[in-house]
């Protein structure tokens, strides 16, 4: 189909500002794209960038190699996840003190942040934050899911700052790999702490939880009153 694949060639000078999804014309599909779609986009990119067919106007070789590399990464689920983990992502979460502001909108503040982080969810489907009319069980399910959130975000690529070179001896190589793995594990821990903090801040500011707590308190009080009335009767 004509719905995927690059429509216009990218100049070599713009390669640094182009991610593999853009290069292969898959930016609309985004992460989670299936292998068949990647293959179709790659074939279209080959027609556009193949050095034999490329016009002299473009320095196609560097771009062509980038297309090859992009295809190699995006068609493979494990490699793609590692790439998606390093691809620009906004790690910021609400500060947690927004409730002090007069025009604070809990759903507009926290909803998009949970939705954005859901891209890394191992377990599907991911429950939505909902709104003021959400039922108590749905709100409980939402928080139960996020407290146990399993992220597939992978920091192996990001932490490979220490390159493992072929000319290194095996002890050096082993040491470098160990250091990189240690760094990746540290980033993963920080990532989980970030998600837990997001959940804690959301819970502290969720107006529905306050309402549910008040309703529970009122129900208990009512129960106690009716017991006392029975005793007095």
Q: Where would I find each of the regions flagged by the language model?
A:
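Accessory regions outside conserved functional cores
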Residues: 1, 111-233
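N-terminal J-domain/J-like co-chaperone modules of DnaJ/Hsp40 proteins
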Residues: 1-54
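Ubiquitin/ubiquitin-like proteostasis machinery centered on ERAD and p97/Cdc48
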Residues: 1-15, 92-112
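Intrinsic disorder
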Residues: 14, 29-36, 58-61, 74-77, ...
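Acidic, Ser/Thr-rich intrinsically disordered and amphipathic helical segments
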Residues: 19, 37, 41-44, 66-69, ...
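Residues that form ligand- and interface-recognition hot spots within folded domains
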Residues: 28-30, 87, 150
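J-domain helical core
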Residues: 32-49, 59-87
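Short amphipathic alpha-helical segments embedded in low-complexity Lys/Glu-rich regions
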Residues: 57-64, 82-92, 99-101, 161-164, ...
